[in-house]
């Protein structure tokens, strides 16, 4: 089952990854002081780092994030190897961790097995006799981890009744994920589309098809996916919260979408009976109905087989992995695959996330860091409260609602209070890696359904594991969450001065808080319900101010001739804008209360160190292919823009570095967004 949240949480980065600092927090070697701050602050702050850290063959991007991610992978590997290096009692967590890692590392066995573990399931697809059986079999396979469906399904908080979960379905079924990869004539997109078609054909050949048959099936798959893409919404349209919510009764679903056998689908997926459902996007589901009725049975089976093989490829032999990597090279520009131990570590950490997380925090996360972080959060809440009070564009009524929502933030730091139970998850080394992953995904899917369908939302549940280098805000629970792994340099260091921590983790805290009041989060109240708590005039003022960010970021080139999508990145840009303003205000509060801290270090004032710290967080290099994909699919702006575009919107930055009207990054006051 492809898990579909009703409303996605807003994270700091799509994939996060940061660098060690000196005890002072700002490493002067990272800088290029020959650059002028007002012309290119990114180069000024971390030009030295970028020059000293060219991209290696393995990475599509590097940076302070990647350094921290690399360190974390080694830490997780050390934890895993304590169990994988020697036999463990059967059924224990140690056995599950060690056995799964060893299976993932055993390429000799997988190369010997080839595609054989997959063959019985491909036979099930090829033996399908009619369209009704097709829907049943693909639902059954999907429930065991083979993503054969043309739509997504899952469970999440009902955004109109956030205390309770709601079953949801929505658009899906695209191997490339994003509709524009099928429809755009952009040169890089055309190259990706061509590579994907070749990928499908090669995968099907490895699965046992001859060249001609594989070509026919790949062509059928591409045609069906293109049909789905044409009916699907783009990334910007998906950000419209209200336009992607269509709650109805189960009976209405059956009546309005009769071309899909919903009874057998939900039965095969393991869902108990339920009364209501959210159909996030209507047109793509109607198009799936048409596809199921109009395409030949052979072409439908070709689509299912292509997606089944693609889902299984990562658990089969090295030839499958090589084909996967070839597609990845075109999409991201990466030149060398990750070593097997990294892939195996990521697999174990993904499957047994909280088991690894518990080991991780016991070994690497001191309780003192959690307490210091909680104090920082309180300081940031105070700063945001002050800025709300001082806002001249909001009425007292809306301010009161905003303050109430802020006061009711749920704050999660480090790790969950209770850990997931993996007792009924089994790993059997007598079975292949693929067979084990089928069983594991079936367990995880059924566990997920049993905990959520017809149940209230568990607000204690975490959406990220402690070892994840990221953070998030969830509007339907009104929570901000900071996993243990992000509470390390350059984000957070208990041994550096306040300015550096406020520019790092303070900016992150403020970023996530701001998501509670961005273009999406502002539509939810303190209880997590989608509820308009704004006056009409205040909403108009808010939208006018956010449009400043849309227009500004839309004018910025991320690559020659290719600009950032200001509408797609609006929420994250509001997060950065608000995060910087809020954290800077919190720093000013600290300096006012502790005048002794208001001193220069290495010739930099606290205000300057604050902004240098923010830039250090986003240090990095990236391949053009990676940036190209990012600006098409990612709601986060590229790293350079999160410095050179974000900071010119912050008044305090101009004063800190004496930025003049003649400087290249200068933005006139009337074109700066003044929001949170």
Report each predicted region and the residues it spans.
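Intrinsically disordered, low-complexity linker/terminal regions across diverse proteins
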Residues: 69, 256-259, 278-282, 338, ...
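Short, Gly/Pro- and small/polar-rich lid/capping loops
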Residues: 21-29
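Hydrophobic/aromatic-rich, well-ordered segments within soluble, folded domains that form packed cores
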Residues: 30-51, 182, 186-206, 396, ...
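Short, solvent-exposed loop/turn and secondary-structure capping segments
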Residues: 28, 52-56, 152-154, 178-180, ...
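Short secondary-structure subsegments characteristic of cysteine-rich extracellular domains
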Residues: 58-80, 212-231, 501-507, 603, ...
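Bacterial Sec-dependent N-terminal signal peptides
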Residues: 1-21
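Active-site-surrounding "flap" and adjacent substrate/cofactor-binding loops of secreted or lumenal enzymes
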Residues: 35-39, 44-111
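Noncatalytic, helix-rich "gating/capping" subdomain that lines the substrate-entry/channel surface
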Residues: 83-375, 379
């Amino acid at each position: 089952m492809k898990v579909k949240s009703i409303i996605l949480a807003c994270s700091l980065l799509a994939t996060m990854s940061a660098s060690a600092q000196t005890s002072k927090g700002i490493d002067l070697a990272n800088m290029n002081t020959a650059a002028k701050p007002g012309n290119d602050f990114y180069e000024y702050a971390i030009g030295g780092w970028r020059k000293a850290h060219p991209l290696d063959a393995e990475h599509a991007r590097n940076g302070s994030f990647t350094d921290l991610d690399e360190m974390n992978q080694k830490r997780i590997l050390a934890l895993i190897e304590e169990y994988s290096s020697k036999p463990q009692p059967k059924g224990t967590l140690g056995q599950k961790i060690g056995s799964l890692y060893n299976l993932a590392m055993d390429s000799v066995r997988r190369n010997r097995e080839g595609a054989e573990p997959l063959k019985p399931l491909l036979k099930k697809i090829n033996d399908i006799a009619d369209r009704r059986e097709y829907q049943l079999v693909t639902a059954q396979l999907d429930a065991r981890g083979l993503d054969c469906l043309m739509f997504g399904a899952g469970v999440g908080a009902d955004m109109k009744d956030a205390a309770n979960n709601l079953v949801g379905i929505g658009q899906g079924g695209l191997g490339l994920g994003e509709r524009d990869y099928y429809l755009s004539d952009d040169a890089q997109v055309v190259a990706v589309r061509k590579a994907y078609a070749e990928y499908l054909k090669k995968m099907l050949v490895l699965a046992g098809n001859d060249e001609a048959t594989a070509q026919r099936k790949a062509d059928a798959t591409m045609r069906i996916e293109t049909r789905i893409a044409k009916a699907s919404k783009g990334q910007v349209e998906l950000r419209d919260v209200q336009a992607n919510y269509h709650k109805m009764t189960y009976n209405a679903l059956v009546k309005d979408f009769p071309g899909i056998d919903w009874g057998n689908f939900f039965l095969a997926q393991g869902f108990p009976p339920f009364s209501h459902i959210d159909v996030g996007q209507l047109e793509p589901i109607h198009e799936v109905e048409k596809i199921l009725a109009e395409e030949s049975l052979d072409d439908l089976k070709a689509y299912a087989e292509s997606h089944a093989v693609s889902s299984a490829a990562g658990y089969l032999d090295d030839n499958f992995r090589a084909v996967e990597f070839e597609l990845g090279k075109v999409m991201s520009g990466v030149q060398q695959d990750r070593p097997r131990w990294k892939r195996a570590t990521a697999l174990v950490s993904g499957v047994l996330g909280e088991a690894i997380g518990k080991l991780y925090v016991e070994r690497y996360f001191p309780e003192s860091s959690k307490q210091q972080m909680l104090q920082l959060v309180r300081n940031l809440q105070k700063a945001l409260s002050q800025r709300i009070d001082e806002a001249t564009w909001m009425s007292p009524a809306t301010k009161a609602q905003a303050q109430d929502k802020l006061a009711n933030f749920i704050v999660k730091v480090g790790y969950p209070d209770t850990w997931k139970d993996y007792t009924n998850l089994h790993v059997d080394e007598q079975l292949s890696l693929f067979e084990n992953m089928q069983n594991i995904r079936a367990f995880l899917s059924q566990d997920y359904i049993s905990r959520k369908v017809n149940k209230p939302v568990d607000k204690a549940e975490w959406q990220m594991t402690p070892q994840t280098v990221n953070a998030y805000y969830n509007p339907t629970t009104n929570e901000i969450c900071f996993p243990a792994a992000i509470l390390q340099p350059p984000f957070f260091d208990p041994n550096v001065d306040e300015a550096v921590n406020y520019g790092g983790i303070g900016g992150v805290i403020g970023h996530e808080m701001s998501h509670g009041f961005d273009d999406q989060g502002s539509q939810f109240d303190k209880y997590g319900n989608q509820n308009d708590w704004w006056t009409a005039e205040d909403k108009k003022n808010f939208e006018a101010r956010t449009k400043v960010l849309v227009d500004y970021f839309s004018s910025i080139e991320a690559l020659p001739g290719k600009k950032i999508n200001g509408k797609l990145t609006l929420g994250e840009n509001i997060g950065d804008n608000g995060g910087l303003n809020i954290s800077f205000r919190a720093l000013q509060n600290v300096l006012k209360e502790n005048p002794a801290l208001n001193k220069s270090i290495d010739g930099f004032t606290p205000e300057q160190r604050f902004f240098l710290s923010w830039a250090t967080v986003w240090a990095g290099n990236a391949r053009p292919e990676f940036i190209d994909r990012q600006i098409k699919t990612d709601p986060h702006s590229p790293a350079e823009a999160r410095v050179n575009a974000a900071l010119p919107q912050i008044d305090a930055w101009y004063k800190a570095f004496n930025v003049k009207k003649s400087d290249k990054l200068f933005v006139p006051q009337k074109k700066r967004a003044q929001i949170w």
